Each structure stands twice: as structure tokens, then as C-alpha cells.
Amino acid sequence: MPRFFTNEIDEENICLTGPDAHHVGFSLRMKAGEPLTVCCNGIDYNCNVRSITGDTVYLDLVEKHRCAAEPTVDVTLFQAVPKLDKLEFIVRKSVELGVTRIVPVLTRRCVSRPDSKDFAKKLVRLNKIAEEAAKQSGRGIVPEVAPMVSYKEALAMIKELDRTVLLYEEEGGRSFGDVGFEGVKSIGLVIGSEGGFDKEEAQAAVETGAVQVWLGKRILRCETAPITALSILMFLTNNM
């Protein structure tokens, strides 16, 4: 069923306008009576097309319910900035797996080092990828790709979360299963770029409250690590 997102909705007068209306009328060529879903803040509004007039699609509400695909935990991925193609892949797959937001972080070992102005130009495309992935995977929200922040700024954000884990390749960290996520509502996941984190960065995260987690003896690529970690996290929090 076609899926569309909106930030606000009037249940008595649900309609689509702009590019979404054009997509319904011209790309999908939908007719009166055909079903589609409008998502607003994690709620699915299942509707039927009533009529299409100009650049507006008028809808009749059939039922509404909480989106079953939305996790019960709020997960923020703090991803050290990799090369753009890898970041696009990470955004798409992270959204499919249930992340709430993605915060690109500039760390010492980042190979790609865009300045804030250059990165801002890429944000439009990254958020478009997030929207496409949200539609494809049946999400109830479009996860945000936030502006790039410094590592210091990321650590300040971590303090506001219930639990944060840092993936670190050196032995000595806990496994995910040893961390404990019972009753936790907000989780941070901190993952390095191609070069990982240096010891000072890892220690700074631990001092901020992050738990150092080790994924095993195999070294994962930076685009594989978030997929692995998010899959484990969703399983452990009963969100698979």
C-alpha cells in the first residue's frame, strides 16, 4: 500500500498536496476508492482516495492505529563521518532497522573531513534517502539525519540519553548481551568511521557514561558495524 508522511493531520479533512498529490495522481495513477496510508508521528491513518482535484488528493479515513513497525525504544546513531557513499548506505539501512535519528560526527580519524557548509549541502540528499527508506520499510516516522557535530558536541548529547554504547575494536569491552536495556527508553549508539576511534576518544565516551562494547574478533567495515549493532539492539529490546 502506498505510504506518505505528514507532520500534522486533520482527521476530518485528510488530504495530500504538492509532490505527494502529484505522485498519487500522475505516477501511481490512483483512482477513487483505492487505499493508501498517511503517517503522522508514528500513527498510521489508513485511507481511501475520495477524489483528486488539481493538485490535491482528498481522502476518507478508514482506520488509524499505532505503526507496528516503530520500535518501542528511541535510538540515536552517532556515526563518525565516513565517505559519502558509505554514509548513504548507513542511512538507508539504519532507517530500515528502526533508528530514530542519525547524527554524523566528525572525529579525529575520519578520512572524509567535510566542513559544515559542504556537509549541509549533502543533508538534503541524506534526508531524502531516509524518507525513501522509511516508506519502503513501513516506518511510522521519517528518521532525521541531523547536521554534522563535533565529537565534543556528540558527548554532550549522549548525557541526555538513558543508555549509550560505544563500539570499540579493542578487546576488553562487554558484549551487547551484558549491557542491559530493561526499562530503557532512549539509547545512543556511537560508531567510528573507517579509522575507528583513538583511545582518548573512547575514554572520553566512557567517562561521559557510555558502555564500551566489543563485537568480537572479526573487524567489521564501518558500514557493516551499525547494521550489526542495530540488529542486535533491536533483538535485545524485543523490536525485531
Give names to the regions the model predicted.
Residues 36, 60, 66-78, 185:
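Mobile, glycine- and charge-enriched loop segments
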Residues 1-66, 119:
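N-terminal positively charged helical leader segments and presequences
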Residues 199-240:
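Structured adenosyl-cofactor binding patch, chiefly the S-adenosyl-L-methionine
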Residues 64-65, 194-195, 217-220:
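Short, acidic/turn-prone active-site loops that include or flank metal/cofactor-
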Residues 161-196, 200-201, 210-214:
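Active-site/ligand-binding-proximal alpha/beta "capping" segment
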